[in-house]
């Protein structure tokens, strides 16, 4: 039975407003979660509008299946495959907006059985979709020390990555870790300098979660796919929660807004320049939560919303 964990959608109005909803438009909510964004989008669509939602979390799918609306459909899978889902429905190049709310959701963090949080003892899992792939425990038990250190450094920006990786491997040799509390304790013991404002396991849990779920690769693939999926004038509205996510989104929007870069002085005909194509996107800026939203929902503090529009290129 699924527990009813509360989820407050971050930047709800801002993200949906960023899509510039047309009543008869076709939209994608690539991260359904508990449906906050989807329900608001549906409330702004007319009878001819359509919303395709995606999530790889079976609990999110269960929530979505309770929505009885002919304009709405839900897909169980990763949002990185959105181009395939759209092609199957013969909607390539016809999507008017894509919304992505990246990272882990509050219900996932708050449910100890999902294994995402060092604050709650539960199985060391961390998979967005517990039916597929390796759990965090399985990966940590089989990975090389150097690989664990690389993941902690790359995806957690953990300065004690090597020391923590060594402690994890040594502990797993003695007795394999299967609980979140065990990993949190090992990391805390291996961290020589503590941050008084942050639990020592924060960066390790983030890094392992990102690795287990291939989160950054998912984002990069979805962004790349969006260019073929969106109609001219279609919008991208993307919420990030940490610098690694935001860096990818920011770089993508900046590069696609600039268009092909031709070295100064390179002799090219007008036909050759035209063949290179123009700007794929027009960046429309970023928004961050206000003081009121952060006070009501502290998890919103680090969020950044970036919006871009597909050009006619």
From Swiss-Prot:
GO MF terms, alphabetically ordered: rRNA (cytosine-N4-)-methyltransferase activity
Binding site residues for S-adenosyl-L-methionine: 35-37, 55, 79, 101, 108
Catalytic activity of the protein: cytidine(1402) in 16S rRNA + S-adenosyl-L-methionine = N(4)-methylcytidine(1402) in 16S rRNA + S-adenosyl-L-homocysteine + H(+)
Cell compartments where the protein resides: Cytoplasm
GO CC terms: cytoplasm
The entry's keywords: Cytoplasm, Methyltransferase, rRNA processing, S-adenosyl-L-methionine, Transferase
Function noted in UniProt: Specifically methylates the N4 position of cytidine in position 1402 (C1402) of 16S rRNA.
Protein name: Ribosomal RNA small subunit methyltransferase H
Organism lineage string: Bacteria, Pseudomonadati, Pseudomonadota, Gammaproteobacteria, Enterobacterales
């Amino acid at each position: 039975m699924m527990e009813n964990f509360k989820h407050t959608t971050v930047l709800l109005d801002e993200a949906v407003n960023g899509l510039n909803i047309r009543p008869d438009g076709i939209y994608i909510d690539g991260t359904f979660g508990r449906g906050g964004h989807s329900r608001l989008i549906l409330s702004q669509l007319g009878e001819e509008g359509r919303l395709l939602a995606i999530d790889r979390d079976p609990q999110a799918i269960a929530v979505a299946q309770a929505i009885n609306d002919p304009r709405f459909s839900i897909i169980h899978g990763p949002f990185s495959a959105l181009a395939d889902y759209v092609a199957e429905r013969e909607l390539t190049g016809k999507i008017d907006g894509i919304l992505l709310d990246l990272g882990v959701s509050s219900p996932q963090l708050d449910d100890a059985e999902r294994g995402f949080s060092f604050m709650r003892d539960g199985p060391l899992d961390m998979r967005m979709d517990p039916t597929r792939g390796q759990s965090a425990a399985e990966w940590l038990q089989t990975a090389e020390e150097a690989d664990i250190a690389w993941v902690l450094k790359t995806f957690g920006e953990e300065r004690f990555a090597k020391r923590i990786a060594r402690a994890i491997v040594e502990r797993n040799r003695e007795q394999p870790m299967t609980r979140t509390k065990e990993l949190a304790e090992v990391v805390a013991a291996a961290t020589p300098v503590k941050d008084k404002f942050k639990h020592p396991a924060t960066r390790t849990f983030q890094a392992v979660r990102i690795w287990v779920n291939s989160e950054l690769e998912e984002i990069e693939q979805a962004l790349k796919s969006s260019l073929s999926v969106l109609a001219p004038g279609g919008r991208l509205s993307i919420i990030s929660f940490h610098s690694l996510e935001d860096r990818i989104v920011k770089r993508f929007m900046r590069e696609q807004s600039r268009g092909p870069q031709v070295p100064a002085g390179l002799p090219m005909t007008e036909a050759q320049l035209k063949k290179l194509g123009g700007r794929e996107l027009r960046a429309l800026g970023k928004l961050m939560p206000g003081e009121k939203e952060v006070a009501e929902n502290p998890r919103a503090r680090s969020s950044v919303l970036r919006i871009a529009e597909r050009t006619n290129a």
